[in-house]
Structure formats: C-alpha cells, structure tokens
Amino acid sequence: MKTPRLLQYLAYPQKITGPIIEAELRDVAIGELCEIRRGWHQKQVVARAQVVGLQRERTVLSLIGNAQGLSRDVVLYPTGRALSAWVGYSVLGAVLDPTGKIVERFTPEVAPISEERVIDVAPPSYASRVGVREPLITGVRAIDGLLTCGVGQRMGIFASAGCGKTMLMHMLIEQTEADVFVIGLIGERGREVTEFVDMLRASHKKEKCVLVFATSDFPSVDRCNAAQLATTVAEYFRDQGKRVVLFIDSMTRYARALRDVALASGERPARRGYPASVFDNLPRLLERPGATSEGSITAFYTVLLESEEEADPMADEIRSILDGHLYLSRKLAGQGHYPAIDVLKSVSRVFGQVTTPTHAEQASAVRKLMTRLEELQLFIDLGEYRPGENIDNDRAMQMRDSLKAWLCQPVAQYSSFDDTLSGMNAFADQN
C-alpha cells in the first residue's frame, strides 16, 4: 500500500464499542490492516482491525473478528498494507473464511498456494476487457431459451424470501459448463452454509468449487471482505485462462454490511438510510467480473427484495449496474413452479449478442405467447373466457399446460441447448 516506514506509530485504543475501535493512529490509510497485541513489548497478535474512517485526530477501525477479550491495554500496530489472501489451485474444493483461511476441505489439495493478492482492487480497465459474444449454457430451459446468458455477463437473481434462490443456484452449479465455481455466502444463516457445504460434498463438481462464507453473526467488515475475497479468487482463476462462474448470495446483505461500516465510521445516512459511499462501493465490486483476453468471470448476484410491490432503491441501484436480471415470482413458487422465473419480468441485456437470428425469433414468439396467456388469465379468473370466439386465444390456451410443463424443471434435470431450442421451436411453430 505504501513505502516502508522508518518509524512505526503505535496507539492505545481510546474507545472500543462492539466491533468499532477509535484510536489516535498517525500515518494510516483507509483499508489498511492493523495488528492488535496485548502490549507494546509483546509480539503475539491477538486480533486484527481494518481502518474504515479518519476523523480529525482519531482513526476509526473495524475489528476482523469479535472484541471478546480486548482491553484498554492492547496496542494497535499499523502494518502498512491492505488485507490480502493467498490464492491458488489449493483453494479448489475448500471452504474459506473472510480472511482466506481454509477451514475445511471436501477434496484433497491439488497444488500448493501460489500467489498473495490484495482483496479490494479496482475493476479491470475497458481496454483489457473483451465483449460478451459466446452463450453460457446453464442447462436451465427458461434461461437458455428465453433469457440466454453470455460468458462474462453479470446477472442478478431478484426475489423475495422463499422463492427458490438457493435452489436455482444449485441448478446452475450442477449444470453450467465452466472450469471453476466460486460461491460467496454473505450474511447467510449458519444452517444455510452447512447445507450448502453438504450439497457441494455430494456434487460431482466439488473439485471445481470454492466456497467463501461470512455468516450473519460475523462483523460487518468481515461480511464485506468475504464478498471481495470471493471475487479475488474468481479473478485469480480468470487470469489463469479459466472460465469462472461466481455466485454472491446475497448482495443485499453485502450492501447492509457496507452501510454498517460507513455509519460506524461517522458517515451520514442518505437514501433509505444508506450513506453515499455505499453507492460508490457497489459498482467497485460489481464491475470486477467480466471477460478479458485471458479468461472470463460470469457472475450471478442474488438480491433479496423486501416486497414485490414496493420500490426498493438498493435493488434498483444494483439492477442498473448489472447486465440483466432473473426475477423469481412468489406466485409461481406458491404454485410449485420451479425454477420460479417470471420470464416476462426478466431480461438478459446480452441476449441479442449471444443468440442466432432464428433463436431470437423463436424466443420472441414464445414471449408473445406468454404475454397473451397472462392477458387471458384475468378473463379466466372472472369466468369470461369463451372458447371459439378468438382462434389465437384458443391456440394459446391449448399450449398453456405444455408451456408451463416445459418451463418447470427439477433440480437434477439437465436440458441440453439443442433440446431447449427444439422444445422452444415447437411452441413457436404452433403460435
């Protein structure tokens, strides 16, 4: 981060409140890592903290870990560097904590650790990127056929609680064609992390997976760092020429962690209680994936909606940055329709770049069919639909059940791209 210091400045904490420490530290920078020791004459590091704010004569730090056992007598030692982690092929098949430490393995180690990387870095420049031109085959009919994603695209999965976000993530991990899968579980329940690890243990792709976690009981700065670490791991494999798929679950809890850190450092709340820096930091993370001349990172970010009816400024901000979104419907989930993707409310902004004219024409025909069925649903609910009055409506009603069955797909069922196009073509020809 900076040149080596000739003098090292130390400080005692003036205030410890939860995970926040205030001290008169000089010559430190935002994001810098500080070691915490029992005394100035002791070398044992008992904790670490990260600089998150600078005020007049005081520095605000956020603990990495909890404050249990700390006292007024501990000493803060600036390290002059930002938080970094060792990454390499050794993390494949492993579970990492927010500091990059391997806490569990579900496959044997394949290679030694090879490189130390700072986890909070700027996105790649436009000159180093390449366009999204190749489709990403996910094996999910609704996505491959009607919402085709591209290699290097960034997609959001928007849903309220209980709509099947985790189920869709499992499908994408099991069926998507990629070299490496990096999963970041940010602010999730401990039970969900356990279940996800169990799923990966049983997966035939476990040797390709890396899981980074920071559960809801972790300090805010740890939750922020976990998302950055997951992205850093994905960037490492992209630089090795790999095709990487990155999952962050969830961006909503990452944004809340950013908010907590910003408020603790003294920032004032702005939109919906979020300080302005949160809206600066979101694109810094979301712009890091993408395709470069070496490899690619295709990213899926889940966003938890507070309500399907009310406007959500954080969800709107994330949606505006990404290259598309999959909207999961609570109504479809309640009907047992999984994956509960509301195709008409979802969009892939690179669809036209990764599909053939024939594919695009067929998808348009199926969308028109779905739009007509949605319009007819009101008449059906009111008992006003009369067969024989409109031949186009009758044709759409005849295909309704088969279209619904085609859009539904069990978690373990894989649909090849050719089969998906063939099934979609059957609906387009009848429409």
Curated annotation (Swiss-Prot):
According to its UniProt record, which reaction does this protein catalyse? ATP + H2O + cellular proteinSide 1 = ADP + phosphate + cellular proteinSide 2
Enzyme class, top EC level, equals translocase
The alphabetized UniProt keywords are: ATP-binding, Cytoplasm, Nucleotide-binding, Protein transport, Translocase, Transport, Virulence
Q: Which residue windows are transmembrane per the record?
A: none
Q: What is the effect of changing residue 376 to P?
A: Retains wild-type levels of ATPase activity. Defective in type III secretion and invasion of cultured cells. Does not bind the SicP-SptP complex
Q: Briefly explain the null phenotype.
A: Deletion of the gene affects the overall stability of the cytoplasmic sorting platform. Disruption mutant is defective in its ability to enter cultured epithelial cells.
- Asked whether the keyword Cytoplasm is assigned, the reply is yes
Question: According to the UniProt record, what happens if one changes residue 28 to M?
Answer: Retains wild-type levels of ATPase activity. Defective in type III secretion and invasion of cultured cells
What, per the annotation, is the impact of changing residue 223 to H? Lack of ATPase activity. Defective in type III secretion and invasion of cultured cells
**Subcellular compartments:** Cytoplasm
E.C. designation(s) = 7.4.2.8
Mutagenesis / variant outcome for changing residue 385 to E: Almost completely abrogates the secretion of SptP and also affects the secretion of early (InvJ/SctP) and middle (SipB/SctE) substrates
Q: Which GO terms describe its molecular function?
A: ATP binding; ATP hydrolysis activity; protein-exporting ATPase activity
- List cellular component terms (GO): cytoplasm; type III protein secretion system complex
The positions annotated for binding ATP are 164-167
Q: What is the effect of changing residue 383 to A?
A: Shows a defect in the secretion of SptP but not in the secretion of early (InvJ/SctP) or middle (SipB/SctE) substrates
**Can you state the subunit structure given in the record?**
The core secretion machinery of the T3SS is composed of approximately 20 different proteins, including cytoplasmic components, a base, an export apparatus and a needle. This subunit is part of the cytosolic complex. Forms homohexamers. Interacts directly with OrgB/SctL (stator protein) and InvI/SctO (stalk protein). Forms a complex with SpaO/SctQ and OrgB/SctL. Interacts with the chaperone/effector protein complex SicP-SptP via its C terminus. Interacts with the effector protein SopD.
Annotated family: Belongs to the ATPase alpha/beta chains family. T3SS ATPase subfamily.
> So what does this one do?
ATPase component of the type III secretion system (T3SS), also called injectisome, which is used to inject bacterial effector proteins into eukaryotic host cells. Acts as a molecular motor to provide the energy that is required for the export of proteins. Required for type III secretion apparatus (T3SA) formation, proper protein secretion, host cell invasion and virulence. May play a critical role in T3SS substrate recognition, disassembly of the effector/chaperone complex and unfolding of the effector in an ATP-dependent manner prior to secretion.
Q: Provide the domain comment.
A: Binding of ATP leads to conformational changes of two loops located outside of the catalytic site. These changes could be critical for interaction with the stalk protein InvI/SctO or with chaperone and effector proteins during type III secretion.
This protein is called SPI-1 type 3 secretion system ATPase
Q: Which organism is it from?
A: Salmonella typhimurium (strain LT2 / SGSC1412 / ATCC 700720)
